[in-house]
Regions:
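Bacterial N-terminal signal peptides
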Residues: 19-29
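A structural boundary/capping signal
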Residues: 11-14, 34-220
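Short, Lys/Arg-enriched N-terminal segments with co-localized hydrophobic residues
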Residues: 1-9
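Enrichment for repetitive, rod-forming helical segments
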Residues: 2-3, 22, 143-144
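Intrinsic low-complexity/disordered segments
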Residues: 2, 32-34
Length: 220
């Protein structure tokens, strides 16, 4: 996950006060792992979506990615904002998240590229948190999932550091694909603080208002 100057750019003044809050949230996680992952019909139980609350500054490295690879940032408003969650899609999402977490070696951008922050597809098999998320989005889009329903998202993690994940918006809530865990959880059961995500209406980012979430115990 992003650290130092990199984290500061991604979070834009949202991080310094969150340590004690996260400690409380992580200790309080009360939902069961079974409830978080799958309902009786082979799909996750429905949960409340993550609501956006105005514009937010895009991470610098995302802007750089857009210059190098415009297609990674393009928004097609003709695509669905949310996808229908089916047993097949759920299995695909869970399997793909776990597979990419195994396939890609986690390395910092400084070790990988010699720079503080760079977003890119991990074509050489190495990457930071945002690179995992970009590849997951690409692979899911190749299966037919609406690109517009999959959003790069910046959070504050359990270590009070900036972190990037992929949010998949569905008719049963918003789910998080994360290189830190193989379980795919509803956004509000990850234990993270949600800072901002890509806009679904234009090339840009929207604020998530620092929404605080609880965590599900014993889910990896």
């Amino acid at each position: 996950p992003p650290q130092g100057q990199k984290g500061d750019d991604m979070l834009s003044n949202h991080r310094s006060f969150m340590g004690p809050v996260l400690a409380i949230l992580l200790a309080a996680g009360g939902a069961s792992a079974a409830q978080a992952q799958q309902g009786s019909a082979g799909i996750p139980v429905a949960s409340a979506p993550a609501d956006a609350s105005g514009d937010a500054r895009a991470p610098y490295a995302w802007t750089d990615l857009c210059k190098r690879s415009p297609a990674e940032c393009r928004v097609n408003i003709g695509e669905a904002e949310r996808v229908e969650m089916t047993p097949k899609l759920w299995k695909t999402i869970v399997a793909l998240n776990s597979r990419i977490n195994r396939e890609i070696e986690a390395v910092t951008d400084e070790d990988h590229w010699g720079v503080v922050d760079r977003w890119d597809l991990p074509e050489d098999g190495k990457g930071d948190c945002e690179d995992f998320a970009l590849l997951k989005r690409k692979r899911l889009a190749e299966t037919g999932v609406s690109r517009r329903a999959m959003l790069m998202t910046v959070v504050i993690d359990e270590e009070n550091a900036g972190h990037a994940v992929l949010m998949v918006r569905t008719d049963r809530g918003d789910f998080i694909l994360d290189n830190k865990r193989n379980a795919v959880l509803p956004w509000n059961q990850t234990g993270y603080v949600y800072v901002k995500r890509e806009s679904q209406m234009r090339t840009g980012w929207t604020s998530l208002g620092g929404a605080q979430t609880s965590t599900v115990a014993s889910v990896r």
